Amino acid sequence: MGRVFKKKGGAKREAEDEKKEEFVIKKKAKKEKSPEPEPEPESESDDDVEDVSDEEVEDEDEDEEEQNIMDFDFEGSAPCDDDRDGIVNMLTQTFLRTDIDMKAMAESIISKAPHGLVLTQAYDDEQTEEDFMVYGLCTTLALNENKENSPKFIKDIFTYLLNRAKKGAPTEIYKKIEEIQEAGDGKTGLFVNERLLNFPTIVVPQLFESIKTDVDKFETKYKTIVYIQKLRIAEGEESNAGSSSSEAPPKKKGKMGKAEKKRAAAAALANAEIEFDNPEDRILFQLKEGKEVHFDFPVHMDVEPGSKFHTIEKEGKKYNPFRRLVIMDEKRFDAFLKKGCDSIVV
């Protein structure tokens, strides 16, 4: 047995019988050290020394490794009222220190159930606070269903995106965001794919399959998807902040204007060392189907210095936190979900 990802039972989830997935995850936990035994007197006779083979030592190591494995049960189910606070926590990983009403956004996500999935710890008859902790969230949310009567949190999301794009994105990306906001046709969705940092990626195929199944059944099909990814860029290359996928480097020498600086940053970032917090996010840029544009912006000023989401060190190199705003068409999004369904990314 290991971690089990399944549907929650009981009255809390009675309406969710269609969402059943099961798989096993194993996570290693540090075992508490036992007091070291008193040293035994050394024997002066070689006859008392027991010869231990390498195979026996390996077997002992394997036995100890098995003892260090702990089992945790997790459940994947449609968002409900009990998950509200946990969903807010997941959303704050995407939107750092913003004026967006996360609670209203969480309530909107819950109202779309049974669309979407949250990952929570399984519980039996006795419930604890940990039973209501959300470990992951995967869903979509229409960004432009009703232009005139959009909820405030939707307007705040567009304000956030436009402000970030104005500082560092090419003009066409800024205009694209404006066009999405003005359309009001419900054909643009926000893809939310959040998990606790370093949560096993074995959950991805089931999460993506659930989203793909739901989206394929929507009456109003998404034509455009907005996705905000979490990533880190190697220190020394953060000057590429605000860089984009959509422009070529300038050929002109001498003093550069704002547009040319953005092009230069875009060209430099193509060779930057990047670590994605969600490993599956890298796949999106390896696909050939459909189209996407993106730009990156730094968020280190929005993260507490001691936070696990701040700068990390890997192989002696520091990586600083960024966000990547991706705008993709339905073909790229569908291919991304399909790829995520087919394989586990590590």
Swiss-Prot record:
This is Protein BCCIP homolog. Residues 1-10 have a biased composition (Basic residues). GO terms for cellular component: nucleus. It comes from Caenorhabditis briggsae. Residues 1-83, 238-260 are annotated as: Disordered. InterPro entries: BCP1_family. Residues 239-248 have a biased composition (Low complexity). Residues 37-83 have a biased composition (Acidic residues). Disulfide bonds: none annotated. Belongs to the BCP1 family. Residues 11-25 have a biased composition (Basic and acidic residues).
